[in-house]
Amino acid sequence: MYNDKLKICSGPETTGWISEQLMTGKIPVTDIFIDIDNKPDQMEVRLKPSSRSSTRTCTSSSQTEVNYVPLLKKVEDTLTMLVSATSRQNAAIEALENRLSTLESSLKPIQDMGKVISSLNRSCAEMVAKYDLLVMTTGRATSTAAAVDAYWKEHKQPPPGPALYEENALKGKIDDPNSYVPDAVQEAYKNLDSTSTLTEENFGKPYISAKDLKEIMYDHLPGFGTAFHQLVQVICKIGKDNNLLDTIHAEFQASLADGDSPQCALIQITKRVPIFQDVPPPTIHIRSRGDIPRACQKSLRPAPPSPKIDRGWVCLFKMQDGKTLGLKI
């Protein structure tokens, strides 16, 4: 009877009923704990609930695995695509770096042309200054100088037809306080003053200004504010005072043509050009050592009794406290 009930019922009700029957002694304990070897036919009663549970668990696990497999497949495919895209990107970056290196190498000659272009720019500026003055002071003169002067004074500008002036006459008008010369003409004349007319003496040796010579030498020197930059200023100043800028420029270019470094070329100028031999360096008055360019600090030395430029002494810095330091190369 109770076997039939066990087969029909299952779940908590069956468990409670079995417990009650065991407590009251209506069901023998041996009938519940079946000996598998002796009573294989009763395995169905005891294992029936567990077999259902086991089936449900297995089915749930199988469903979970079935659900995860496509997701894992998608993740794997996505990672594969990401790795492939990253590899292509790395290859593209490497190719771009190679192209940039090639482009940089190709542009290096153009960078070296910068110095030549700078020199041409200065030459063109002088040519423009000459042209400005030429237009203002020469041409088909149809009026006298007096008429031109009257027109300038009245209209504050040159007449439409340019008047022909000699350079010396124009210089005399500019120097004469009673004569009126337009500002534009004066400016053009000052710009032209940086050049000189070709003669038998300076033919093939075009005049160069101290500013242009300084810029040319600066273009060859590395860094900024070094002792050699200071030496360039001293050389240009002394060369301008002695009207030997052309000689200094020629000496500098000759040293470079011989393969000397720019620094060596500057030193050769101080030893070969007579105006620098046995000449004391200039004295520069400063407030403190901090006013000296940082690049020159390591080249400062206590000033000797009689320093000379051709012995490597560029200049002397005299501070307010009376201390004097020499710039030595």
Swiss-Prot record:
Main location: virion
Keywords, comma-separated and alphabetical: Coiled coil, Host cytoplasm, Host-virus interaction, Inhibition of host IKBKE by virus, Inhibition of host innate immune response by virus, Inhibition of host IRF7 by virus, Inhibition of host RLR pathway by virus, Inhibition of host TBK1 by virus, Inhibition of host TLR pathway by virus, Interferon antiviral system evasion, Isopeptide bond, Phosphoprotein, RNA-binding, Suppressor of RNA silencing, Transcription, Ubl conjugation, Viral immunoevasion, Viral RNA replication, Virion
Cross-link named Glycyl lysine isopeptide (Lys-Gly) (interchain with G-Cter in ubiquitin), sites: K298
UniProt-listed GO biological process terms: symbiont-mediated suppression of host cytoplasmic pattern recognition receptor signaling pathway via inhibition of IKBKE activity; symbiont-mediated suppression of host cytoplasmic pattern recognition receptor signaling pathway via inhibition of IRF7 activity; symbiont-mediated suppression of host cytoplasmic pattern recognition receptor signaling pathway via inhibition of TBK1 activity; symbiont-mediated suppression of host toll-like receptor signaling pathway
Domain of life, source organism: Viruses
Modified residues (Phosphothreonine): T195, T199
Coiled coil region boundaries: 84-112
Post-translational modification comment from the UniProt entry: Phosphorylated by host IKBKE. Phosphorylation contributes to efficient viral replication and transcription. Ubiquitinated by host TRIM6 to facilitate virus replication.
GO cellular component terms listed in the entry, alphabetical order: host cell cytoplasm; virion component
MF terms (GO), sorted A to Z: RNA binding
Modified-residue entries (Phosphoserine), positions: S194, S306
Location in or out of the cell: Virion; Host cytoplasm
CDD domains assigned: V35-RBD_P-protein-C_like
Pfam families assigned to the protein according to its UniProt record, in alphabetical order: Filo_VP35
Domain VP35 IID, residue spans: 204-329
Gene3D superfamilies to which the protein is assigned, alphabetical: Filoviridae VP35, C-terminal inhibitory domain, beta-sheet subdomain, Filoviridae VP35, C-terminal inhibitory domain, helical subdomain
Family: Belongs to the filoviridae polymerase cofactor VP35 family.
Function according to Swiss-Prot or TrEMBL: Plays an essential role in viral RNA synthesis and also a role in suppressing innate immune signaling. Acts as a polymerase cofactor in the RNA polymerase transcription and replication complexes. Serves as nucleoprotein/NP monomer chaperone prior to the formation of the large oligomeric RNA-bound complexes. Regulates RNA synthesis by modulating NP-RNA interactions and interacting with DYNLL1. VP35-NP interaction controls the switch between RNA-bound NP and free NP and thus the switch between genome replication and genome packaging into the nucleocapsid.
Subunit structure: Homodimer. Homooligomer; via the coiled coil domain. Interacts with nucleoprotein NP and polymerase L; VP35 bridges L and NP and allows the formation of the polymerase complex. Also interacts with VP30; this interaction is regulated by VP30 phosphorylation. Interacts with host IKBKE and TBK1; the interactions lead to inhibition of cellular antiviral response by blocking necessary interactions of IKBKE and TBK1 with their substrate IRF3.
Stated name of the protein: Polymerase cofactor VP35
Annotated organism of origin: Reston ebolavirus (strain Philippines-96) (REBOV)
Lineage, highest ranks first: Viruses, Riboviria, Orthornavirae, Negarnaviricota, Haploviricotina
